Amino acid sequence: MAAFLLVFGLLPLANWIPGGHSAPWFGVVAADLLTGLSVALGTGIVVGILAGKIRSGAVGARLDLSAAIERRWAVWVGGLALGAFGLYVLVSITAFSARPLLIDEIIQVVQARILAAGKLWVPAEPHQFFFSSMHLVEQEGRVYGQFPIGGPAMLALGSLVRGEWLVNPVFGALSVGLFGALVRRVEPRAGTALLATGLFALAPFAVFMSASHMNHVPTLLWLLIGMVGLVRSVSPSGRWLDGLVCGLGFGLAATIRPADAMAFAAPAGVWLLARAGSRTERRVGPLLGAGLGVALPLLALAWVNLETTGAPLRFGYTVLWGRAHDLGFHGTPWGPTHTPARGIELINVFFLRLQSYLFEAAGPSLLPATAALALARRLTPFDRYLLVGSVLLVGFYFAYWHDGFYLGPRFMYPLLPVLVLWTARLPAVLEARHTRTERGEPPTGESRPGSALWPTVRRAVLATIVIGAVLGLATSVPLRLSQYRGGLISLRWNADRAAAHSGITNALVLVRESWGAELVARMWALGVPRSDAETIYRAADPCRLDLSLGALEPAGIRGAAAAAALEPLLADSTRPAQPEAATGDPTLRLTPGVTYPPDCNAKIQANLTGFTLYPPLLLARQPDNIYARDLGARDSLLLRDYPGRAIYLLKPDSRAVGADPVFHRLDPDSLLREWRGASRK
């Protein structure tokens, strides 16, 4: 494992493999980390030497501190959990405006509110394409989110009190308590266990993720419950109930992120099965309890899938994107085919990012854990379990096609327990090189021959870690917080508050999106499969696509036939460029040297006057205002579906980054005249 972390965490393999994923930022980031490590290491060596000269009674003091921690373990962990909760809440408000910002978060909150209303899906609108969104499934008149039901079910607890944003801070704080309970059972040194718990609670990767709406946080909570149940199950006093807790934890994690749960449930099952079949132990009860615990959530998941997708083993993302979304080396929903080489690139990029995002320290974040794993002479059974589960997790994402970068390499979030545990163990592992503590005995100060240098090394390493953390807290963390606070500005706008301030009620609000978003929505309206729509949009000249859609729409050509009619546009992929300054949209690809017709130029000019995003408006709570995508003359369908309402156009008055959308009152008669004129062209 240490060798893997050294190779994948320090070498830019992705940059050495032609094509595919890469880490273009590696040189700059590596230079910064190397500089920070040099400063921390140099200072740490000086501190380690000086501390050795003034060291007095350190062994006894550590023994006293360890005993004090052990006596009041629950108080220490409880304090960390409460403090972490307050920190997560504060970061959620300051960094993310207590709102879901990524499309994954938005759609899971939409599904959570459907669940909170007592439904698994809602009926489609008469013209659903005005209300469509990426990751929102529209199947046979049913509308629901693409994600496994467990994540939205966790958020639904917050929906019941109009506070989805509080769910992850609560679950993150509970995870701190669970990790504290777990690590105290598997780590004999109280000080090391407390340090690991503190790192788990306060690692910036954990803080930012716990302040978000992402489903990785509740997944880790249930994984930890499964691990606590597992440790109790394999103890001499393990009972059927412990196995049930273990199974429920892994089973509920599977209802949120099935691959993450499988990675840690599979080795747990093997461990329990081995104990049940052992000639000396024959512990069958925990195995049966775990089997029942896993089965109950999975049966519930299968029933929900049956009621939504129509098949117990089919998920919403398979309905939306096809089998290309699944694990394996094959074609993907969009982009190149996923191959083992691309899998290696992704895993490498994940671990290179972890070097910064895990602790935001002055040096590489994975270095202490790597050193501890390399120097450790023996592993406990739980250590082996945790490492096997971690390897399986990495293996699953090696076979997955998507990068999924957000707030760090989020797919690696379940590695947090093993990484913080081995980071915290490094000082003890170094001490074990010259005392008997490697067997879990308390330090006695009795050194082995030839180990006089090890105490200084240990002090220098410990000082380096502390200095690196302090430097990171003073430099990297504020920069990361500023980065998150300044990102995704347009998704933070509160439609309900703005509408109430403007006195807008019982209105039909037409939301002006970019030309590119309109083109994608029009393909969805024609029934073009989502993966085909993404592929075509990423390749086609937007004007040619617009004209092609204009020919298909009145002809009533839909579904596979529409996708086939648009397929020749894929040949555009080698020609267009992305002149964002000329279009206002970085996703539009214009063909150089081509003179566009007036209608296409008008679309470009409309882009330049400002546009906004539709998906966040799916979360507007004011029920009497209807927010629908603006699709030009097709909006006349909305006027028939929702008669008697005041009509507004929602768009910013400027294309400046962060410009708030503005409600513009529209006259229905003028709109109808404009649409009739457009239809006669």
Give the location of each predicted region.
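Transmembrane alpha-helix segments characteristic
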Residues: L5-F8, W76-Y88, F200, P267, ...
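Membrane-lumen/periplasm interface segments of multi-pass, membrane-embedded glycan/lipid transferases
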Residues: G20-G36, F129-V137, R283-L287, L306, ...
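Hydrophobic, aromatic-rich transmembrane alpha-helices
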Residues: I49, L174-G180, G269-L272, S278, ...
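Signature aromatic-anchored transmembrane alpha helix within multi-pass, membrane-resident enzymes
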Residues: V75-G79, L248, G269, G291-A295, ...
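Multi-pass, polyprenyl lipid-linked donor-dependent membrane glycosyltransferases
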Residues: I103, V167-G177, A190, L194-L230, ...
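Hydrophobic/aromatic-rich transmembrane helices and adjacent perimembrane loops
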Residues: Q108-V109, M209-S210, H216, I256, ...
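Perimembrane helix-loop-helix junctions
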Residues: G229-L244, M262-W303
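Membrane-interface helix-loop-helix junctions at transmembrane boundaries of multi-pass membrane enzymes
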Residues: S237-W240, R275-A290, A369-S390, D403, ...
